[in-house]
Amino acid sequence: MSSTPPKKYYKVAVLLFEGVDILDFTAPMEVFTHTSHNRNPDNPDRVFQINTIARSRTVNAKKALTVQTDLLLEDAMQGLADFDIMVVPGGPPSLLNALVASNPREVELIRSFATLPPKTPDEPRVLFSICTGAFLVGAAGLLTGVSVTTHHRAIEKLREFCIRVNGEGASPPEVSHKRYIDAGVLKVGSARLLTAAGVSSCLDASLYLVSQLTSLDMSAFISRVMEYDWKGQLSE
């Protein structure tokens, strides 16, 4: 007699910082909030529980949207093992350059998350970067010998940046322009790495992640609800 498998739920940490690109973090959140076991928009049994994380209680995104965050960085660090997924959005290059150069606590949070042991042996945690958020992941020293993507204008800069960060002898990442890349489990760390290119491609990557953690049918359902034409692995 077959039994129904238990429902799975995932806790998501969405890392924010001043000047963050709006769609980089709101697009994954939109996809995740539509993911429910019962597909009931009025009373959803949501698969993903989302928490925004930042160094301050409020974050101004692109000087256009003020977000009240759920957790401060230090509180998130204390409860980091509770999370299954970390979303790392991007921002304008000048902002990311300045942020990375300051050796921020955000980088330590990313590194700590990526090196946590899996919650279950058969399902690693997921580190999901969008656009120039890959530079924060790179600053954590995690992009060694893996395939990644980022905004098309930042491809060469990310490769050069990681070579500097990783140092001599370390394998550089293979950086190419695709809608998203699932690199599998990191060579440095224990998390599964998913990277998305510029801005709107994170919709495709988010739907892909949902298909991996739930089902392809669920992602197709969400794309219909969102009236979005889900794109696959496009190189241009």
Swiss-Prot record:
Gene3D superfamilies: 3.40.50.880. It holds the Pfam family DJ-1_PfpI. Disulfide bonds: none annotated. It is a single-pass membrane protein. The lineage of its organism: Eukaryota, Fungi, Dikarya, Ascomycota, Pezizomycotina. Induction: Expressed during copper starvation via the regulation of both aceA and macA transcription factors. It comes from the Eukaryota. The active site is at 131. It comes from Aspergillus fumigatus (strain ATCC MYA-4609 / CBS 101355 / FGSC A1100 / Af293) (Neosartorya fumigata). This is Isonitrile hydratase-like protein xanA. GO terms for cellular component: membrane. Keywords: Lyase, Membrane, Transmembrane, Transmembrane helix. Pathway: Secondary metabolite biosynthesis. The chain crosses the membrane at residues 126-146. One of its GO terms (molecular function) is lyase activity.
